[in-house]
């Protein structure tokens, strides 16, 4: 009789553990998804395209590529945008709006930093410019046909 009770008790205990392990927990949205949805609702023309691993790809008429990266090896958030070599003011406005929302800093700071980075590319400084402005790392790159900007914030900030 004692062995039967011990067996029943152990089976009930194992069943309770299995139920606790496989019970459904509420789905938690990633911060990256939240930021992408916020961008889509607050900036005209931005649409969430798809998510691949830790990158959310977005679309906008002023860009060729537009994405938000979350939790890389050296950064906590990344905003990447690519356009034609001769970028338009709408492109810088989009980067400024998105940067202000993603990194929660004032929009004029992002406008100043991204404009400086894009304007520094040229004969004197080359086609790849890296700079730091208001705790944001900005890297501007251009090729013969495209110009891009990657704005990141380090993990420790």
Residue ranges of each PLM-predicted region?
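Bacterial N-terminal signal peptides that target proteins for export
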Residues: 2-14
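Bacterial N-terminal signal peptides
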Residues: 13-21
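Sec/Tat signal peptide C-region and signal peptidase I cleavage site
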Residues: 24-29
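N-terminal secretory signal peptides
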Residues: 30-74
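Extracellular/mature segments of secreted proteins
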Residues: 38-43, 76-81, 124-127, 147-151
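Short Gly/Thr-rich strand-loop-strand
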Residues: 46-57, 107-137
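Long, charged/polar, surface-exposed segments that mediate recognition or autoinhibition
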Residues: 70-121
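Short, exposed beta-strand-loop hairpins at the edges of beta-sheets
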Residues: 128-155
């Amino acid at each position: 009789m004692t062995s039967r009770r011990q067996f029943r008790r152990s089976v009930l205990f194992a069943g309770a553990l299995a139920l606790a392990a496989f019970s459904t927990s509420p789905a938690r949205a990633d911060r990256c998804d939240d930021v992408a949805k916020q961008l889509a609702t607050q900036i005209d023309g931005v649409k969430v395209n798809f998510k691949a691993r830790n990158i959310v790809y977005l679309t906008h008429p002023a860009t060729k590529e537009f994405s938000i990266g979350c939790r890389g090896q050296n950064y906590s958030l990344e905003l990447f945008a690519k356009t034609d070599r001769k970028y338009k003011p709408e492109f810088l406005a989009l980067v400024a709006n998105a940067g202000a929302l993603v990194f929660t800093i004032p929009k004029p700071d992002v406008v100043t930093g991204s404009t400086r980075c894009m304007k520094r590319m040229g004969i004197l400084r080359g086609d790849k410019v890296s700079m730091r402005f208001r705790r944001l790392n900005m890297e501007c790159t251009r090729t013969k046909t495209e110009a891009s900007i990657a704005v990141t914030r380090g993990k420790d900030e």
